[in-house]
């Protein structure tokens, strides 16, 4: 017997998106869709004047739906007023037939430009390449990032800056991508000139998706993806990038620092601004070079002394 699904869409201020998304993931056990946050426009700069975002959760169309809808309404009513610009609006429920479920999320993923030259496009979208563009083709699957989230975006921009400004236009090798997910950072590193990249993730499914995306981009010979633990990897990486939770960054601080070569770079993301000092304290042996922020997220770029 096939299962149809219900999409529950909630309109909230941009500042509330991550709070609501986390709640929906915990409540439903499924992924979420976010419209007009970073995926419905080619230029991220145009999003500042868009006050409301649509966050969509997904539930089986069964007897539990009404109870879940009420819990979502209660969460909105209780949590929403603490966010500037919030006005309560009841969630909108739409039925998604089983045959459409697997591909429904894809309509929200459009080509997006990040930094000066990087462009991320899904495999099913057409894109007219411009001079100088470095195009990443990606088929992330429902469980992995598209590259447009602020945490990933800031990592991509940091990689581009390090290569362009600090190393004459070419990202130095080797590069270590910790928590690779869909492999987008590793592919970007290769496009930016790195000749040797190691990509690790504790999730075998992430490694499988990364392998597929490497093949899509012709990078399979330059990136080595695996579930190898940090402890098993050698040191000497010129660039280490880790886009994972702040608590995990702190727990792995010693291992991450040890993987960076003298004079090398460590890019950390996945950090809520309120936890920035907590993370910085764990990496106090390194020099903090830059600290960009977007929405409630912070990215830290360190350099290891020679």
From Swiss-Prot:
Enzyme Commission (EC) number: 2.1.1.-
Family matches, as InterPro entries: Ribosomal_L11_MeTrfase_PrmA, Ribosomal_PrmA_MeTrfase, SAM-dependent_MTases_sf
Highest rank taxon of the organism: Bacteria
Designated name of the protein: Ribosomal protein L11 methyltransferase
GO MF terms held by the record: protein-lysine N-methyltransferase activity
One GO biological process term: methylation
Provenance organism: Geobacter sp. (strain M21)
Alphabetical UniProt keywords: Cytoplasm, Methyltransferase, S-adenosyl-L-methionine, Transferase
Binding annotation for S-adenosyl-L-methionine: 152, 179, 201, 243
Gene this chain is encoded by: prmA
Record's subcellular location: Cytoplasm
Function: Methylates ribosomal protein L11.
Family in the record: Belongs to the methyltransferase superfamily. PrmA family.
GO CC, alphabetical: cytoplasm
Record field: catalytic activity: L-lysyl-[protein] + 3 S-adenosyl-L-methionine = N(6),N(6),N(6)-trimethyl-L-lysyl-[protein] + 3 S-adenosyl-L-homocysteine + 3 H(+)
PANTHER family on file: ELECTRON TRANSFER FLAVOPROTEIN BETA SUBUNIT LYSINE METHYLTRANSFERASE (PTHR43648:SF1)
Record SUPFAM superfamilies: S-adenosyl-L-methionine-dependent methyltransferases
